[in-house]
């Protein structure tokens, strides 16, 4: 098909009918100044010649720079009109002088450019003007060459031998026959071509030091005239010997080939070997697009600039078409390549020679399907159509279906014009499946008598095309005549029975529509695109009986840019940009590119809507199925990460035979995949296995037969078990699994899965056969469950449940889940399961491999608020541990899936978001502790925290390695349930169709997705498992591979359990930006900003002196680390130590009064005493006043002071010694006395009173003896000796509640609101604070000191953060709890709107009081009461925790008998 090197120039008829004669004017060789007065100002000169640093003139033409050029000259013909700046001459004179003026205009611009590099460049030279009567052809060009040589030799300003000359030889190929792909290789032009070559040889012999541009201006000169009715006209294809109409593809390929032929000729000529002479072909081609408008004439300035830009590009990269619209910016020589480019310094290699490389073998395959038989009788329904029933095949489309370039050898770009229809993916049938993979060759394996496929090469009307009616360059509108032609051919062909034979017709279109979209957005709109497809499909639907039509979705074409833009890949970019300019030319991130991507998606979406509208499913013997395998196509990559151009034809646009083969495999796979589960993404880097029809359901998939109900398609070819039963769980294949079992609650039991919408009463029915992890109803084709997936690998699987019934029903088999079950009941389920497996004769207990799925936790959360202790995360952890321990101890050969439970927030969203569909009136019965909580409430936050603790405890248990001690047992956490994406309806409400009628239990759609997600997780490596489930996603079932054939465990995933990095300090990051103090020192405490505070102080007990904040060197004595104290410590800076003073230092670095170190001398205004009780507060207040009055560092009257009072731990600890002598009234009275002293003695003071807490002893819970000072703690805190149910502890709860109630009133005491410069604010963050827990759900010891009664530095940091944040919250709206989660950015900032510390007055919350004496807001008392109840419960935790610790020391029990604390 290609040209031989010896006939490169001749073979393409390069010069048309001759060299156009030149118009000249006598003797003129200089420019008339008035013709182009604005030449230089037409474009900015952006180059910097000085930066090139070139001084010495070049000795070689291959290192010739613009600065070396002394003279610019031209010979040849230019019939280009002057630009708008030209003077108005007489029409006839202008016509005669146009060529000469065009030449002088162009050369002047070039001279102007060169003058910036070499100011001494001479005036340009053009051939003398002669009248039209004496125009010749090549002879005239020879005459001009001789005259030029003569004038150069006579020019006194030019050193003819030493000066470098730039000579431009213009010619015009007056015929477009070179655009004809089948142009004659011999003709009358040979002599003219030889003469042109003779002219170049003449210049080479006569002119030393010359760089010659060979420029064909035919398209620039002639193309506008095709539209003007002049003597020049486009030659007809017949006149050139073309076989038919010249297409856009023909045009762009032949343009490229024309240019490449010139380059190859010149590169291989003797010119390229010279040091003082070079000839370079400079192309001028228009962009090839739809002829919608007349191409505008080009002024000489634009032509000269385009020529200059071409000279600045290496040969082989001159791929920018001549623009008819915009003037492109001028290019500059680079420092790396400052010279004019020749063939030698461009390292040019002809692509016409590269094509001779060895052609890669075509890609075949093998089909090993067990069932290749047709239906027993010819089917009458398209929905029961087997592959072997197909007798006829056809196709419609464009060049990708016509097979352009599919068989071309690498580099043979000209051969892309050949249509290799026999290799076409959807319709070709060259050879057979072993060497050529196409859809017909696949189908011929099922029915060797298939008809209609194309073979060999040729156009759509060739004999070999048969029913392949695709046409290169076709768009969607061309499908209509193609469909008409195909129908006529089928009706009239005698080898087929038009009425009886089953037909497959594949339609694929859209690439050309997208490539030309920007040229004509209206014609190529998505609406017109799909309307044209509709009309074509309507013809098939109306006239073709017994047809299955593949409508292949248009490909994602934007990825072609990746191939085009990667300069490391050799591609003919001139061809690419001409074929698909709308895709390749827009800038990255441009609106044009975004528009294209959007249109591409709309093409796909509207096609999808058309096919799925049901328009073509009105007859039993006809259907159209959308095949989306091209929807998301990535460019194939090489092993080096480069775009793989072996996947493409030599033009880098069409498919190679390899990609045709992979497209065929992908189409076949799509045809067998269920609708809704079809593969949509491919990259074609690797071959695609030919899958077989499912033996249970062997039909081509349609919208009506596609997987029925809730089935799934499994495409795995490798389904064999291990050669011998594995002994290691880490080498377990799916086909090795013999037994499935499940444990859990109503979700696993299947409650309500099959219930009809609205049938709430039926939710109690346990549809175990549909359960995601253990159901075995139906088959995978209509019911997706884990057992049904595993049965595809091992048909002898057992253990799964069928039908309905409770756990004791024989249908349940090894599904021992019980509705309503909580974690504490899991151990009982395990024992029952183990016994059933041991007793059942169908199970070889010791030899059979088992998969056991465990899911529990939802019911614990539904009941957690009824007993916080019983449903604590620690107990959840222990129950789970006990159950798994039994499995680990008792069950051989088992893989246990531990599945995360459904987050209760999902339940709330669905249930509360659909009050008209969900039984909201039964919320308290169904799941009270989840569904009845108020939004943004403390209780809801507590539930969320407990949920996270449950999840963390599961992860911690598995990652402890406890169950990795045996080779035949493993527990794997499958986290797909961790994050659920709910389907949301258009009205914004969650879609209840995924749930049972109670809106709590999942329905069958939900269970189907759970099964798929579980299977995906089981094949994903540990550490890389999907932890998100989108309920609306198309989840395909992955397959084990030869490289990774096993169910994944930590060991075969090479996974190492993570270790948490140590935290270096407990500092905080300060993100506040408004640090300035008030413009003037405020006189009102209600206008007090943090930066106004000058002094800090504190009163309290050992929690304020920071006893035990750091580990002590002495085993007998805990040290007071006052510098780390939460409310008064000032050691270091905030970045390493979070304390209230260190926060305030960020606002005022000169703040005074804070403690440092451990000594009394550096305590500052920290007057707290370790053993202090409330009764000691007045004394501490007096001590503080005296210290302040005595200090010379502060101005007592003017400085603003922040004082924090926190007391009560010792009072409550000693309450049990003598309950009668401890009352809430007495406690508050002492506090009030201290506040009175401060009120009377200290001006300008803001007093924080922190609510009491008694939860510290809860640290003993679950610590297994962590606390080293248990007995001393009891002696220090006598209440720890009592049982939680004892009367004294019950009384302590009441006292605690009373204390907090009375304390909350202090902010509202009328006395403390009388002064403008004094305020008392109760900070309640401790009111509802929960014990900080670790990941296992046990009390986190890092918050506490060695004696377990005081805070560590981490605990002090959390208290400081909570106190600071309380200070920035309005009274009545303060946070009453602290969740102790670590975060360096938890500190709040004052806002521009509210820059002050909050007091009662500036909180705008002073209530209307009916009783002045009380001074208490009723709402606040109520809130305090609620908070006090919880704190009372925490007091109970204190005692029970210690009692549990005693029990553990007295009796070490096995894990399943760990005592449960009953709070």
Curated annotation (Swiss-Prot):
Q: Which SUPFAM superfamilies match?
A: SGNH hydrolase
Question: From the UniProt record, which GO molecular function terms apply?
Answer: lysophospholipase activity; phospholipase A2 activity; retinyl-palmitate esterase activity; triacylglycerol lipase activity
Q: Does the keyword Cell wall biogenesis/degradation apply?
A: no
Q: Which UniProt keywords apply?
A: Cell membrane, Glycoprotein, Hydrolase, Lipid metabolism, Membrane, Phospholipid metabolism, Repeat, Signal, Transmembrane, Transmembrane helix
> What cellular component terms from Gene Ontology apply here?
apical plasma membrane; brush border membrane
- Active site per UniProt: 399, 513, 654
Sites carrying sugar chains: 173, 432, 492, 528, 589, 645, 782, 796, 1113, 1221, 1379, 1383
Chain spans, region Disordered: 356-384
Extracellular compartment segments: 25-1419
What is written about domains in the entry's comments?
Repeat 2 contains the catalytic domain.
Question: Which protein, by its recorded name, is this?
Answer: Phospholipase B1, membrane-associated
Q: What is the lineage of its organism?
A: Eukaryota, Metazoa, Chordata, Craniata, Vertebrata
């Amino acid at each position: 098909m290609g040209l031989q090197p010896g006939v490169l120039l001749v073979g393409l008829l390069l010069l048309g009918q001759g060299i156009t004669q030149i118009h000249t004017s006598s003797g003129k060789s200089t420019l008339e100044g008035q013709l182009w007065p604005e030449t230089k100002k037409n474009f900015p000169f952006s180059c910097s010649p000085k930066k090139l640093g070139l001084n010495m003139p070049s000795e070689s033409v291959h290192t010739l720079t613009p600065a070396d050029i002394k003279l610019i000259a031209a010979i040849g013909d230019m019939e280009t009109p002057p630009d708008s700046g030209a003077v108005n001459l007489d029409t006839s004179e202008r016509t005669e002088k146009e060529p000469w003026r065009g030449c002088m205009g162009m050369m002047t611009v070039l001279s102007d450019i060169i003058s910036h590099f070499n100011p001494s460049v001479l005036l340009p030279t053009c051939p003398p003007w002669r009248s039209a009567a004496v125009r010749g052809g090549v002879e005239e060009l020879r005459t001009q060459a001789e005259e030029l040589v003569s004038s150069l030799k006579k020019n006194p300003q030019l050193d003819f031998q030493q000066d470098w000359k730039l000579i431009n030889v213009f010619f015009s190929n007056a015929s477009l026959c070179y655009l004809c792909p089948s142009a004659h290789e011999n003709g009358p032009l040979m002599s003219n071509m030889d003469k042109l070559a003779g002219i170049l040889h003449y210049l080479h012999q006569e002119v030393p030091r010359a760089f010659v541009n060979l420029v064909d201006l035919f398209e620039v000169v002639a193309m506008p005239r095709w539209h003007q009715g002049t003597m020049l006209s486009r030659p007809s294809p017949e006149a050139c010997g073309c076989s038919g109409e010249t297409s856009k593809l023909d045009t762009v390929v032949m343009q490229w080939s024309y240019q490449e032929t010139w380059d190859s000729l010149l590169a291989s000529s003797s010119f390229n070997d010279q040091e003082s002479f070079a000839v370079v072909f400079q192309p001028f081609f228009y962009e090839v697009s739809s002829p919608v408008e007349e191409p505008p004439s080009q002024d000489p300035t634009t032509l000269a600039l385009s020529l200059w830009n071409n000279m600045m590009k290496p040969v082989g990269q001159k791929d920018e078409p001549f623009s008819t619209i915009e003037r492109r910016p001028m290019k500059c020589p680079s420092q790396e390549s400052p010279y004019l480019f020749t063939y030698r310094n461009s390292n040019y290699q002809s692509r016409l020679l590269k094509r001779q490389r060895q052609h890669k073998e075509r890609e075949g395959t093998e089909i090993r399907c067990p069932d290749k038989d047709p239906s027993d009788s010819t089917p009458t329904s398209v929905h029961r159509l087997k592959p072997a029933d197909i007798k006829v095949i056809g196709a419609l489309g464009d060049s990708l279906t016509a097979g352009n370039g599919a068989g071309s050898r690498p580099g043979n770009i000209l051969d892309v014009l050949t249509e290799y229809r026999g290799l076409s993916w959807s319709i070709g049938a060259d050879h057979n499946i072993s060497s050529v993979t196409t859809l017909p060759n696949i189908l011929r394996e099922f029915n060797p008598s298939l008809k209609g496929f194309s073979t060999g090469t040729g156009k759509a009307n060739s004999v070999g095309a048969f029913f392949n009616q695709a046409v290169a360059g076709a768009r969607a509108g061309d499908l209509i005549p193609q469909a008409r032609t195909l129908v006529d051919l089928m009706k009239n062909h005698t080898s087929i029975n038009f009425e009886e034979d089953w037909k497959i017709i594949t339609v694929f279109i859209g690439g050309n529509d997208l490539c030309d979209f920007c040229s004509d957005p209206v014609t190529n709109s998505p609406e017109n695109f799909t309307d044209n497809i509709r009309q074509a499909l309507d013809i098939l639907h109306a006239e073709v009986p017994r047809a299955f039509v593949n409508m292949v979705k248009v490909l994602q074409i934007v990825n072609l840019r990746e191939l085009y833009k990667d300069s490391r890949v050799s591609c003919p970019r001139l061809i690419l940009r001409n074929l698909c300019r709308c895709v390749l030319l827009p800038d990255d991130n441009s609106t044009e590119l975004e528009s294209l991507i959007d249109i591409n998606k709309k093409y796909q979406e509207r096609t999808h809507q058309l096919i799925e509208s049901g328009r073509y499913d009105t007859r039993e013997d006809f259907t159209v199925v959308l095949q989306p395998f091209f929807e998301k196509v990535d460019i194939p990559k090489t092993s080096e990460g480069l775009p793989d151009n072996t996947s493409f034809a030599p033009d880098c646009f069409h498919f190679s035979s390899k990609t045709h083969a992979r497209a065929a495999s992908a189409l076949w796979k799509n045809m067998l995949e269920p609708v809704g589960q079809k593969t949509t993404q491919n990259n074609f880097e690797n071959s695609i296995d030919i899958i077989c029809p499912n033996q249970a359901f062997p039909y081509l998939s349609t919208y009506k037969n596609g997987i029925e109900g809730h089935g799934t398609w499994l495409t795995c070819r490798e389904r064999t078990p291990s050669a011998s039963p594995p002994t290691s769980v880490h080498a377990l294949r799916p086909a090795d699994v013999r037994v499935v079992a499940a444990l859990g609650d109503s979700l696993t039991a299947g409650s309500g899965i099959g219930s009809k919408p609205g049938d709430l009463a039926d939710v109690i029915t346990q549809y175990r056969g549909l359960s995601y992890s253990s159901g075995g109803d139906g088959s995978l084709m209509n019911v997706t469950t884990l057992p049904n997936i595993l049965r595809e690998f091992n048909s002898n699987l057992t253990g799964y449940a069928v039908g309905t019934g409770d756990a004791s029903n024989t249908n349940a088999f090894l599904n021992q889940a019980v509705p309503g079950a909580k974690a504490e009941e899991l151990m009982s389920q395990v024992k029952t399961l183990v016994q059933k497996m041991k007793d059942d004769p169908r199970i070889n207990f010791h030899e059979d491999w088992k998969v056991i799925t465990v899911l529990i936790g939802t019911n614990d959360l539904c009941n957690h608020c009824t007993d916080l202790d019983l449903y604590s995360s620690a107990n959840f952890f222990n129950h789970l541990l006990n159950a798994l321990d039994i499995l680990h101890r008792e069950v051989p050969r088992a893989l246990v899936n531990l599945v995360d439970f459904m987050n209760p927030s999902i339940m709330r969203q669905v249930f509360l978001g659909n009050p008209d569909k969900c039984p909201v009136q039964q919320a308290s019965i169904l799941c009270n502790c989840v569904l009845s909580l108020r939004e943004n409430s403390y209780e809801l936050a507590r539930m969320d925290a407990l949920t996270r603790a449950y999840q963390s405890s599961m992860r911690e248990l598995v990652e402890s390695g406890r169950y990795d001690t045996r080779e035949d047992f493993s527990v794997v956490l499958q986290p797909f349930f961790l994050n659920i994406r709910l389907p949301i309806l258009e009205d914004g409400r969650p879609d209840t169709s995924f749930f049972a009628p109670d809106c709590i239990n999942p329905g069958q759609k939900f269970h189907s997705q759970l099964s798929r997600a579980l299977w995906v997780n089981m094949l994903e490596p540990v550490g890389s498992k999907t932890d998100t489930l989108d309920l609306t996603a198309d989840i395909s079932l992955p397959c084990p591979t030869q490289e990774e054939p096993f169910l994944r465990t930590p060991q075969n995933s090479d996974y190492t359990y993570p270790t948490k990095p140590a935290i270096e300090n407990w500092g905080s990051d300060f993100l506040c930006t408004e640090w300035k103090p008030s413009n003037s020192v405020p006189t009102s405490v209600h206008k007090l900003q943090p930066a106004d505070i000058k002094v800090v102080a504190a009163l309290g007990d050992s929690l304020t002196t920071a006893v035990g904040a750091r580990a002590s060197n002495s085993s007998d004595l805990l040290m007071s680390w006052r510098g780390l104290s939460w409310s008064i410590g000032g050691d270091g800076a905030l970045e390493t130590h979070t304390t209230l003073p260190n926060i305030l230092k960020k606002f005022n670095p000169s703040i005074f009064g804070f403690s440092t170190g451990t000594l009394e001398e550096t305590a500052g205004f920290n007057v707290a005493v370790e053993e202090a009780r409330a009764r000691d507060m007045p004394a501490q207040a007096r001590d503080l006043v005296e210290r302040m009055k005595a200090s010379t560092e502060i101005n007592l009257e003017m400085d603003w002071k922040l004082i924090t009072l926190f007391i009560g731990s010792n009072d409550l600890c000693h309450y049990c010694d003598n309950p009668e002598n401890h009352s809430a009234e007495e406690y508050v009275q002492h506090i009030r006395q201290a506040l009175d002293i401060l009120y009377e003695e200290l001006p300008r003071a803001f007093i924080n009173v922190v609510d009491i807490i008694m939860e510290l002893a809860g640290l003993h819970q679950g610590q297994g003896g962590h606390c080293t000072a248990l007995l001393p703690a009891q002696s220090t805190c006598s209440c720890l000796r009592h049982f939680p149910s004892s009367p004294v502890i019950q009384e302590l709860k009441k006292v605690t509640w009373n204390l907090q109630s009375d304390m909350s009133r202090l902010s509202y005491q009328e006395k403390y609101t009388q002064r403008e410069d004094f305020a008392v604010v109760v900070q309640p963050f401790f009111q509802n604070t929960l014990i900080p827990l670790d990941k296992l759900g046990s009390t986190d010891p890092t918050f506490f000191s060695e004696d377990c009664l005081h805070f560590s530095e981490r605990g002090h940091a959390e208290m400081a953060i909570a106190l600071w944040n309380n200070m920035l919250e309005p009274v009545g709206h303060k946070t009453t709890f602290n969740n102790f989660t670590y975060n360096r950015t938890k500190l709040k900032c004052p806002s521009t709107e509210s820059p002050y510390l909050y007091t009662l007055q500036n909180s705008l919350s002073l209530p209307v009081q009916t009783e002045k004496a009380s001074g208490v807001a009723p709402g606040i008392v109520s809130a305090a009461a609620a908070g006090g109840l919880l704190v009372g419960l925490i007091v109970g935790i204190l005692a029970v925790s210690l009692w549990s610790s005693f029990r553990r020391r007295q009796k070490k029990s096995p894990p399943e008998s760990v005592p449960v604390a009953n709070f």
